[in-house]
């Protein structure tokens, strides 16, 4: 580790590589480690417990050198954060292919993974950490916002005004929760064990206020609910303790969820009954004992959430495998409340809708402002998109390179890609735009406790789909393509793929963008057609998605 090293992406239109494709990969890799973006940049950790951008600093430097030397007809191969080869390919091939954290299934356990990681043979890539397209907490914000909006529509007449949400976790992902709640006019109480993380969300305006006691927190929550005021309150504490205490006191939140780093019982979740400092010491001294405490705390955490559900609260799992750990530890009712995808998001997935994100390689916020306006002109009828973009412009603070996210579906993403490429070509924006997405998408994940939970045909654990997604994106000319294991829910529980593509204003990019931004969301439609979802079948027929065994 280099203790004082600071990495920031270059800005402007001057290249340090041989082409914009390589430059985009370089800048987004560096952006992942920007101190304003990454949770622990000195240890190369971007977000999500131990999700890293490169295996170590030596590997990081070698990746940077490789990208700077890479020709337009070559492809760099990265194996779990380490550059291992450069091969001649062709101009339309990806400039980088990445595989992170992949293990043969029988060996896909945290214990085996950590042993291999300690030996310097692998790293945990999470989703967008090791695939170089993390844009800070905004990256998950709209998904969280849309989930809560769906809850408001289904249960509370379309608004969260006068309703409050109990949740936990203010890390890189969970940090989106307080702002997503207040953007839906609700009140949030978010429990966080790490004061530093809570302060970071205050600094970036995702969180309104922070307190140290449950009494202070509930006074603020009760006042805001009574007055119909949107407010987010951070409470320094341990979720397993606070959730149970609130239930014992007879407090009944309207909504309950959680986004602690429960996917990793050792490096992520902090057990109850000890301070953060004590937990960190135990983690180093006796990892096995730590995991026992952590797992026991997760069981209590889930028991409290089940109790809230039994008492009438709207309770859902936010995809961190908290239920999975509790179930494995012997708590039979762990899955008594649903995951957020089957409960609220799957209808969007059936349309090929998912998190479409883009970043201005220039570093100029004005470029994002121009793309915002152009996108709103492109989709004048999409009121949800207009509402989101306007809210994001007002409320979201950029981290690192200016970026935006919005959820677009099959057909829409290709139109947006063509639009952005034209903006670059016409000089409306000052440098190329990089387009990517989370691995949490409609057709790029196999994750039975999250994205593919409770599939209609029972295909939750089928792992072919993310591999097909990665392969079609690679042959269609994505700028870099990644295949990962264990993101979101932890080692052994998921396979997922990512893609990033550069709009550099060229005619060649027009063709690549059209191909990739059609097939990528198209895989989401196909995957849900195959599972028997009527909504997906209707989309496929209406938009002429060619599926050999579907009667058109």
From Swiss-Prot:
Active-site residues, Swiss-Prot/TrEMBL: 406
Cofactor(s) it depends on: NAD(+)
Keywords of this entry: Cytoplasm, Histidine metabolism, Lyase, NAD
Pathway(s) where this gene product acts: Amino-acid degradation; L-histidine degradation into L-glutamate; N-formimidoyl-L-glutamate from L-histidine: step 2/3
Gene Ontology molecular functions: urocanate hydratase activity
Localization per record: Cytoplasm
Catalytic activity reported: 4-imidazolone-5-propanoate = trans-urocanate + H2O
Primary localization class, coarse: cytoplasm
Sequence positions that bind NAD(+): 48-49, 126, 172-174, 192, 197, 238-239, 259-263, 269-270, 318, 488
EC class of the enzyme, as a word: lyase
Protein name: Urocanate hydratase
Source species: Herpetosiphon aurantiacus (strain ATCC 23779 / DSM 785 / 114-95)
Lineage: Bacteria, Bacillati, Chloroflexota, Chloroflexia, Herpetosiphonales
